[in-house]
Amino acid sequence: MSNIDLIIKKEISLDELREKIIKGYDITKEEAMQLVEAPLEDLCSVANEIRKYFCSNTFDMCSIINAKSGKCSENCKFCAQSSHYDTKCDEYDILDKEKILEQGKSDFNKGVLRYSIVTSGRALYGKEIDEVYDAIETLNKETDGYICASLGLLDEEGFNKMKNAGLKRVHNNLEASRNFFSKVCTTHTYDDKINAIKAAQKAGMVVCSGGIMGMGETWEDRIDMAIELRELGIMSIPVNMLNPIASTPFENIEPLTEDDMRRIVAIYRFINPRAFIRLAGGRGLMKDKGKSCFLSGANAAITGDMLTTAGISIETDKKMVEELGYKIELKED
């Protein structure tokens, strides 16, 4: 056995790694890969300590509205809204701004901190841009909440326009690692995603970006994506668990276990210690609705319904996270 083999097989010290991270150290891919074999309870406990050190007990809670549904030109294999698959999902154009405003006001009144307008499709085009602009502008005028949006692969000009409407944060998931991305989608590329994220950042936007776990990717893929997000400076990272949708290519994939998700969340905390790790789609499949993940490094959530699947009520989520000792409060970007 070589010296390299001995080094790789040497059990990593979680406590030593925690202390290095607290002092500002960025863990390497090799160190992150060793965490895949670390004892789960110990790993999650130390990840929670790292979360407390950098983020205290602040919890970030957001909600979304499916403001344009279905008829998407892209072929993402997980997605109910792709026109490539016969999923029978709802199809409609941009919702009336009064409807978007109504749900936003309701969610803010229930205690949500951020409210995101999400639209299907590769990007917004023509009058769609003006319609979403008007909705964002109206929300900013008539509510005190923080407005976000997920608008696909806009260019810098499009992001600048939305910024002028008062938009501060844009969501654009990487979805997967560079290596695995082509197994998820072939109608746009990983670099298209990266370019859109950088265009939003250049326009002065804060970007929220993460991915979907359980699509057949390896642990190396998951870690590669976490490191990519760190390099992009992402401070809000949605971690979705695949919810297999009938008639999509991923319909028969077995969902991950809660222990899988706990380990993923914990490793993401080690790699991105200062970020808000946000449980997102698929959380409703977990028996504990994500409670164990909120003790394993996660400190944010999308609450309420997802885009095409039922979620967990705002009231239920608030009760759970407050019982865990969190304080739901907005940390300004």
Swiss-Prot record:
Q: Locate the Radical SAM core domain: which residues?
A: 54-283
**Does the keyword Metal-binding feature in the UniProt annotation?**
yes
Name the EC number(s). Answer: 2.8.1.6
Query: Any idea which positions bind [4Fe-4S] cluster?
Result: C72, C76, C79
Q: Could you list this entry's UniProt keywords, alphabetically sorted.
A: 2Fe-2S, 4Fe-4S, Biotin biosynthesis, Iron, Iron-sulfur, Metal-binding, S-adenosyl-L-methionine, Transferase
Q: Where does [2Fe-2S] cluster bind?
A: S116, C148, C208, R278
- SMART domains with a match to the protein in the record: BATS, Elp3
Q: Name one GO biological process term.
A: biotin biosynthetic process
Question: Which InterPro entries did the record assign?
Answer: Aldolase_TIM, BATS_dom, Biotin_synth/BioAB, Biotin_synthase, Elp3/MiaA/NifB-like_rSAM, rSAM
Keyword tRNA-binding part of the UniProt annotation: no
The protein's matches in PROSITE patterns, at most eight in alphabetical order, are given as: RADICAL_SAM
Q: Which reaction does it catalyse?
A: (4R,5S)-dethiobiotin + (sulfur carrier)-SH + 2 reduced [2Fe-2S]-[ferredoxin] + 2 S-adenosyl-L-methionine = (sulfur carrier)-H + biotin + 2 5'-deoxyadenosine + 2 L-methionine + 2 oxidized [2Fe-2S]-[ferredoxin]
Cofactor requirements of the protein: [4Fe-4S] cluster; [2Fe-2S] cluster
- Disulfide connectivity for this sequence is none
What binding details are noted for the cofactor?
A: Binds 1 [4Fe-4S] cluster. The cluster is coordinated with 3 cysteines and an exchangeable S-adenosyl-L-methionine. Binds 1 [2Fe-2S] cluster. The cluster is coordinated with 3 cysteines and 1 arginine.
According to UniProt, this protein's pathway is: Cofactor biosynthesis; biotin biosynthesis; biotin from 7,8-diaminononanoate: step 2/2
Q: Which GO terms fall under molecular function for this chain's record?
A: 2 iron, 2 sulfur cluster binding; 4 iron, 4 sulfur cluster binding; biotin synthase activity; iron ion binding
Q: What does this protein do?
A: Catalyzes the conversion of dethiobiotin (DTB) to biotin by the insertion of a sulfur atom into dethiobiotin via a radical-based mechanism.
The subunit structure is:
Homodimer.
Give the family, as the similarity comment puts it. Answer: Belongs to the radical SAM superfamily. Biotin synthase family.
Q: What is this protein called?
A: Biotin synthase
Origin organism of this chain? Brachyspira hyodysenteriae (strain ATCC 49526 / WA1)
Which taxonomic lineage does the organism of this UniProt entry have?
Answer: Bacteria, Pseudomonadati, Spirochaetota, Spirochaetia, Brachyspirales
